[in-house]
Amino acid sequence: MSEIKDVIVQGLWKNNSALVQLLGLCPLLAVTSTATNALGLGLATTLVLTLTNLTISTLRHWTPAEIRIPIYVMIIASVVSAVQMLINAYAFGLYQSLGIFIPLIVTNCIVVGRAEAFAAKKGPALSALDGFSIGMGATCAMFVLGSLREIIGNGTLFDGADALLGSWAKVLRVEIFRTDSPFLLAMLPPGAFIGLGLMLAGKYLIDEKMKKRRTEAVAERALPNGETGNV
């Protein structure tokens, strides 16, 4: 149980692929102009990570070490092609918005990295959980960045959600403030870099605060009864 918890915590926070490892920055910065696009690519990446980790882990005993990387890439490419066709069939608007970044999941360092570092060494169930956790960690980072850029740039949230979730999702669109002209800095790549930098700084501050609290808690437990630690 502790191993399962550790895999989840590592994927979502401690070893977050976007905010700690800084992998997959090309799609992270290019696609996150809206919350819908960010969520769509994030979920697609999560599905690919889960399925590829599961497949590679299942076949790990029959995969020759000398040619394992080409085999991993072939498996990843097959899964990405299937996911791309699913998005094309059931969410064509999102497919058009994401464009080339769906097939580029094949070359995403996150996917290949987890296949080599985790799935090739662990069992199928734990590998699938690792892929899901890493994918959801990246999805959360994409969604937060996409939401911030959309709100600051257009004053809306979930604009175009129907492209991802269907026509019923039009009701999810929220107009936070009205603007006649979008704030282009937030919508263009410089805004993505600035937003990512702020998110990295925020995560660092949260980690430092949590570390300080843990240190104080350990120090309090180490003191004899009745002492407060004050000089």
UniProtKB/Swiss-Prot annotation:
Where would you find the membrane-spanning parts of this chain? 18-38, 39-59, 63-83, 86-106, 125-145, 182-202
Q: What InterPro entries has UniProt attached to this entry? A: NqrDE/RnfAE, RnfE
Q: What is its EC number?
A: 7.-.-.-
Query: What sort of enzyme, by top EC class, is this?
Result: translocase
The main location is membrane
How does the record classify its membrane topology? Answer: Multi-pass membrane protein
GO BP annotations of the record are: electron transport chain
Does the record bear Cell inner membrane in its keywords? Answer: yes
Q: Name one Pfam family in it.
A: Rnf-Nqr
Location within or outside the cell: Cell inner membrane
Q: Which UniProt keywords apply?
A: Cell inner membrane, Cell membrane, Electron transport, Membrane, Translocase, Transmembrane, Transmembrane helix, Transport
Q: Could you tell me the superkingdom of the organism this chain comes from? A: Bacteria
Q: NCBIfam families of this UniProt entry?
A: PRK12405.1, rnfE
State its role: Part of a membrane-bound complex that couples electron transfer with translocation of ions across the membrane. Required to maintain the reduced state of SoxR.
Q: How does the record describe its quaternary structure?
A: The complex is composed of six subunits: RsxA, RsxB, RsxC, RsxD, RsxE and RsxG.
State what protein this is by name.
Answer: Ion-translocating oxidoreductase complex subunit E
| Gene symbol of the encoding locus | rsxE
